[in-house]
Amino acid sequence: MIYITPIAQKHFTKLLAGKKPGTQIRVFVVNPGTVHAKCNVCFCPPEEFKTSDVVIEFDLFSVHVDSVYVSFLKDAKIDVMINELDSQLTIKAPNATKECNNTRNNMNNDLLEDRVRNVLQFQINPQLELHGGSVSLIRITEDLLAVIKFYGGCNGCAMASYTIKEGIETTLKNLFPELKGVLDMTQHQHGTHSFY
């Protein structure tokens, strides 16, 4: 389903060496089945493995793909171009823009908790990953509050409360008007792991 070139596999293996043990790679599509479809890659720690994941095994790591994205990632190719200054990841997914009505309808009909979890994983976490952090949904309360927990560089970060109100809560409430707000259950401990 997804082909990763040998040089890209080496690149991922090197990046994963500095991550929490058991962390793998996740490949996903933002706006699948539209002309705005964009494929992305992020780290996937063990606590974010999902039962709906399709797991593709490579020699030194595995790639997790939520089953709703499988048809969009058929025949995808991941490569990396390395020059003297930097490296550039390239993802070619010829089916990412193709409409798959059943899949898109299933995505829209997911439980609120699943839809919120997908937004955190596929929209919020790629941004937080730039700071070495991530956020997970713990649960949605009966009062329709999303209970979240920060990990990595976001734990203890002085900007965490701003990130919650201006970033996460605003995004989630715009997408899911039924949500009343976001609660952070992280035991924030500022340390060398904290981004700011």
Swiss-Prot record:
Binds 1 [4Fe-4S] cluster per subunit. The cluster is presumably bound at the interface of two monomers. Keywords: 4Fe-4S, Iron, Iron-sulfur, Metal-binding. One of its GO terms (molecular function) is 4 iron, 4 sulfur cluster binding. Pfam families: Fe-S_biosyn, NifU. [4Fe-4S] cluster binds at residues 154, 157. Its cofactor is [4Fe-4S] cluster. The keyword Secreted does not apply. One of its GO terms (biological process) is iron-sulfur cluster assembly. The keyword Transcription regulation does not apply. Homodimer. Belongs to the NfuA family. PANTHER family: FE_S BIOGENESIS PROTEIN NFUA, IRON-SULFUR CLUSTER SCAFFOLD PROTEIN NFU-RELATED. Involved in iron-sulfur cluster biogenesis. Binds a 4Fe-4S cluster, can transfer this cluster to apoproteins, and thereby intervenes in the maturation of Fe/S proteins. Could also act as a scaffold/chaperone for damaged Fe/S proteins. This is Fe/S biogenesis protein NfuA. It comes from Blochmanniella pennsylvanica (strain BPEN). The lineage of its organism: Bacteria, Pseudomonadati, Pseudomonadota, Gammaproteobacteria, Enterobacterales.
